[in-house]
Regions:
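Short alpha-helix
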Residues: 314-330
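N-terminal auxiliary segments of SAM/dcSAM-dependent transferases
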Residues: 108-160
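Short, glycine-/aromatic-enriched active-site segment of Class I SAM-dependent methyltransferases
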Residues: 295-314
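A short glycine-rich, Lys/Arg-flanked "PGG" loop and its adjoining helix->strand segment in the class I
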Residues: 277-289
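Canonical tetratricopeptide repeat
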Residues: 6, 40, 74, 108-109, ...
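Class I SAM-dependent methyltransferase SAM/SAH-binding core
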Residues: 202, 208-253
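A short acidic, Gly/Pro-enriched loop at the edge of an enzyme's catalytic core
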Residues: 254-264
Length: 363
């Protein structure tokens, strides 16, 4: 039966989900009292993209093997992924009552409390986690947030965890589901400024390479930077990028020599970076004279703070503040294009803006 599960896992990874789940069913029928087979079957269904089946087996597993914490944790993770945090929380609480101080359980409880908007509970779990992991940047971030402080940037782990999970379906999810046009708008803005296609581009937070896809071939190099290895793997398949660096946006800018690129693009990335103070001056330094920095932001209202952390855990920026920062850093010819629909969020249009800033030809 274990062999059936192993084969099922292999088939699931090869995108043969139906056959994989059938094998898992056979294994479960043949070994109904084996908790390891149950865990394997749940994993097969999960890897096959059959979430409902995975949850059904996990719920059955919790009934059959109530003492096996691993099955209950697996169920809780599945429920969180299906946006059922209240249901997940109940299972995390059971595990916590039996095994206090378990890191994954505490992280799960914190996540559920944040998702359900229960800030008192979130602060409590963040306190427990910080006592357990005092040097963990992600824990420090959530602890600050749940205690009423707004961190001015997010630790890289926040972004990596989001986008590694997203990678294979990212283009489809964004372009079709969220009416996401930013990479095309950035590509159009670049081609309007470089009609001969002669430029080198640093694409910060390149994701699956949509800016490159919309640009097509250029007479120069496109260098992609992203924290998510899985995103980079997807982007590489287009055959448009010259090379990639797996590093965060701030480090990429800091480590790039001065006067190096004709253009820098940044599509839907600064919403995760937050504070632009370390971004804008370095972008100016890295650009060649006459080069362009093109990026998108979610809009914070003019009656709001310059930087606002939304419940989505993305930062919104005030357009007038961004324009001021660009000009103060030394950019000229700054254009802000307001976009009524940057993307869709919970079936509602989310406003944003595209900023295009040129480095002066002479210092």
């Amino acid at each position: 039966h274990v062999a059936q599960i192993e084969l099922g896992l292999l088939l699931a990874q090869q995108k043969q989900g139906e056959e994989a789940v059938q094998l898992a069913m056979q294994a479960l029928a043949g070994a109904p009292k084996d908790s390891q087979v149950m865990v394997g079957a749940i994993n097969v269904a999960h890897l096959s993209g059959q979430s409902d089946q995975a949850v059904a087996w996990a719920e059955d597993g919790v009934r059959r093997f109530p003492e096996v914490a691993g099955i209950r944790l697996f169920l809780a993770r599945l429920l969180v992924a299906l946006d059922r945090p209240k249901d997940a929380q109940a299972h995390y609480e059971v595990v916590h009552s039996r095994v206090p101080g378990h890191e994954e359980t505490l992280r799960g409880l914190l996540s559920c409390a944040v998702r359900t908007g229960d800030n008192d509970k979130a602060a409590h779990w963040a306190d427990e986690l910080l006592a357990l992991k005092p040097n963990d940047a992600l824990v420090q971030y959530w602890h600050a947030l749940t205690h009423g402080q707004m961190p001015t940037t997010q630790p890289p782990e926040v972004v990596t965890s989001i986008f590694d999970d997203y990678a294979t379906n990212f283009d489809l999810h964004l372009v079709r589901g969220l009416k996401y046009q930013t990479p095309k708008l950035i590509a159009d803005a670049l081609l309007a400024r470089f009609p001969d296609r002669k430029f080198n581009l640093l694409d910060l937070g390149c994701g699956t390479g949509l800016v490159g896809v919309y640009l097509g071939r250029i007479d120069g190099h496109i260098i992609g930077v992203d924290l998510s290895e899985k995103m980079i793997e997807q982007a590489a398949r287009h055959g448009i990028y010259s090379r990639f660096h797996r590093v965060n946006v701030l480090d990429a800018l800091r480590e790039t020599p001065a006067d190096h690129y004709e253009a820098i693009s940044c599509a839907d990335v600064l919403v995760y970076v937050g504070d632009l103070a370390p971004v804008i001056p370095n972008a100016l330094r890295v650009l060649k004279p006459g080069g362009h920095f093109i990026f998108s932001c979610e809009t914070a209202g003019e009656d709001e703070a310059d930087l606002v952390l939304r419940p989505s855990q993305r930062y919104a920026h005030k357009a007038s503040s961004v324009e001021r920062q660009l000009r103060e850093a030394g950019f000229d010819d700054v254009v802000i294009e307001h976009l009524p629909v940057l993307r869709m969020e919970n079936n509602q249009p989310l406003p944003g803006f595209l900023a295009v800033a040129r480095k002066p030809l002479t210092a």
